[in-house]
């Protein structure tokens, strides 16, 4: 048996409500890596032209024209908000743990994965916005 997981299961079973705090690690576990092979596959032109190595730091680049800036950001949002979740089971498994409970999720994630996995949007607070709103 796994003592920490058993303890967590006991806590969940006895809880009146559950508050989940979720950050970038959960999205990374679901396959949203902002660098590495995924970045090279999705942004080869920006990597070659600008020397970018990941999506996060590229977002701070002072693009010389609005066209180039929005070419980058529209693709970044498409890949991280609208394309299928690479490993959707991460969010589906969490929802299965919470489904019949009084829960609330506080997240810094902007990728809309909670909503796309079926979480009730009235039980979510995404403090850093939502790519779907171009925030």
Predicted regions mapped to residue ranges:
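Conserved catalytic core of sirtuin-type NAD+-dependent deacylases
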Residues: 1-135
């Amino acid at each position: 048996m796994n003592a920490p997981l058993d303890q967590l299961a006991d806590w969940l079973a006895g809880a009146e409500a559950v508050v989940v705090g979720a950050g970038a690690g959960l999205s990374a576990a679901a396959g949203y890596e902002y660098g590495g092979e995924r970045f090279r596959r999705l942004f080869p032109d920006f990597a070659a032209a600008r020397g970018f190595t990941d999506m996060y730091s590229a977002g701070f680049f002072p693009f010389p024209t609005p066209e180039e800036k929005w070419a980058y950001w529209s693709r970044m949002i498409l890949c991280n908000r609208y394309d299928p979740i690479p490993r959707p089971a991460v969010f589906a498994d969490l929802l299965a743990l919470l489904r019949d409970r009084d829960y609330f999720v506080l997240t810094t994630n902007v990728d809309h994965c909670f909503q796309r996995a079926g979480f009730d949007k009235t039980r979510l607070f995404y403090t850093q916005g939502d790519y779907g709103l171009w925030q």
